[in-house]
Amino acid sequence: MNSPPPKLKSTPFNARPNSPPHAGGIEDVGTTFNPLCSPLLTDLYQLTMCYAYWKANRHLQPSTFELFFRKNPFKGEFTIFAGLTEVIAFIRNWSLTRKDIDFLESTQALGAHVDSNFFKWLSKLNTDDVKIYAVKEGTVIFPKEPLIRIEGPLAICQLLETTIVNLTNYASLITTNAARMRNAAGEKKVLLEFGLRRAQGPDGAISASRYSFMGGFDGTSNVLASQMF
């Protein structure tokens, strides 16, 4: 997640619920719609890097992380940015539970090699000092442009990285594909998403329904998605 100096024009917001309206203009994002979206939905090396920062007393160092991509999907000329609402909801609600901490302490990769005081610190970690800058969700974007900029203490920003990439990659892929189909079909055609039976699991199906609609589809066969959104 590195890029040239950003030129984002959106305004920053604090990640906590009592903050001002965030970039992208969404006033209230609540929680994520996917129950799998938790602080543990990350790569192990993010936790080991966080521990290294903590041991070196660099965990509170001010830092900036930026999200970008290198190539448009489908050999196309543009991408539609999506997933920002989920990113913001995830960051606002980010908090490790006692159960999460107990699990991390029990793992072979961390428990036997990590100072126990690190887990105590981790249990109190939050996103109070995290700020986000972003282009508006649904914007046409291009490769190597900064899309999201995360500012805050180094350790927490590191722990957010993997999940942010996950929440935006698939969302942008589906939204872009839907927009391409809408452009090809024209404005007068009715487009219905019917991918549930072939989707990559329930969470993939729900996401596909949501972001197909964002990309220009008129409806979905997915009854649950219709109820949720």
Tell where the protein language model's regions lie, with residue ranges.
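Ordered alpha/beta subdomains of enzyme catalytic regions
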Residues: N2-M228
